[in-house]
Amino acid sequence: MQVLIGTSKGLMVYEILPEKIPKELAIHFLGFSVNMIFVDERSHRWWVGIAHRHWGQKVHYTDDQGTCWKEAKLPSYQGFKMINGAPAKLKEIWSMQHGGADSERLWLGTEPGGLFSSTNGGVTFELNEPLWDHASRQKEGKWFGAGSDFPFIHSIEINPHNSSHLYVAISCAGIFESMDNGASWQPRNKGLLATYLPNPNVEVGQDPHQLLMNPDFPNVLWQQNHCGIYFTKNGGKLWTEVFLKKGIS
């Protein structure tokens, strides 16, 4: 089994075998920070998001496990603005996900909170305007950065039984669900607590750190949150905190 590890000094590839010390196979993009790694299980293509200090953000992919890398066209915020009227600019690539049964669909999560999609296998990406223009975003303070200047989309989960159904996790804003391939979005944060805010029960302003879906039961999701670990059995309509007497909780 191969394991890909993104670090501030490059992409590390290791071979993991039972009862053996992991073996380093390769280092790619030596000296550059690799912020995002995604392996498309459908095509086995590797994708990476790279932060160059001089050239900024870059997206690269390989179809032969790193023998040959190609640079993809970056998603663009050209023509879009932040809520304060300033021009929106790509700051960081955070996450990627495939489109399930839609073989050419890819989703890309970024900072400052834009979700991009591709319908041609990553040749081009377009900003998902319904989420970018979501009413909850237009009120300053509802979407904000956590450990960063701006909100960012770090998790994207696709229903394997219905590729039009997806969730994104935004820090800070919360979990949002779309049932129509991104044409509309609903916040799904009931039951979460944002103890760092004056009103901890806010619908938008939550800080999920990671979101995972059970592929066999897509209504079951888990999230590691700034304020605890939560799960839902009804697709995010209500979240329940996990309480453990011992261990992580």
What is each of the regions a protein language model found here?
Residues 1-249:
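Extracellular glycan-interacting surfaces
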